[in-house]
Amino acid sequence: MKFLGVKVYRFPLVKYYWPFFVGFGLTFYGVAKIQNAMMDTAEFINDPRHPRFKKGDLEKK
C-alpha cells in the first residue's frame, strides 16, 4: 500500500523504538535549555549576534 508515494510497512515501529523517540525528545529539550542559559551569561549577553538585538532590545543588561 502506498500513501503519497511512501511504502507502508507492517512493522510496529513505535512499539520497539519508543525509547529512542523519547530519548531524542529529552535530549533536544535539554540542549535547547542549556543553549538558552548559555546565551544569557555575562560573557555573551552583549554579543551583537544575540537574538535580543533582532527584537530591538538594544539596552545593555
UniProtKB/Swiss-Prot annotation:
Q: State the annotated membrane topology for this chain.
A: Single-pass membrane protein
Q: Which Pfam families match?
A: ATP-synt_J (PF04911)
Q: Which GO terms describe its molecular function?
A: proton-transporting ATP synthase activity, rotational mechanism
Q: Which keywords describe this protein according to UniProt?
A: ATP synthesis, CF(0), Hydrogen ion transport, Ion transport, Membrane, Mitochondrion, Mitochondrion inner membrane, Transmembrane, Transmembrane helix, Transport
Q: Which residues cross the membrane?
A: 13-32
Superkingdom assignment: Eukaryota
What is one term from the GO cellular component aspect held by the record? Answer: mitochondrial inner membrane
Q: Where in the cell is it found?
A: Mitochondrion inner membrane
The task this protein performs is described as: Mitochondrial membrane ATP synthase (F(1)F(0) ATP synthase or Complex V) produces ATP from ADP in the presence of a proton gradient across the membrane which is generated by electron transport complexes of the respiratory chain. F-type ATP synthases consist of two structural domains, F(1) - containing the extramembraneous catalytic core, and F(0) - containing the membrane proton channel, linked together by a central stalk and a peripheral stalk.
Query: What family is it from?
Result: Belongs to the ATPase j subunit family.
Q: How does it assemble?
A: F-type ATP synthases have 2 components, the catalytic core F(1) and the membrane-embedded component F(0), linked together by a central stalk and a peripheral stalk. The central stalk, also called rotor shaft, is often seen as part of F(1). The peripheral stalk is seen as part of F(0). F(0) contains the membrane channel next to the rotor. F-type ATP synthases form dimers but each monomer functions independently in ATP generation.
Q: What's this protein's name?
A: ATP synthase subunit J, mitochondrial
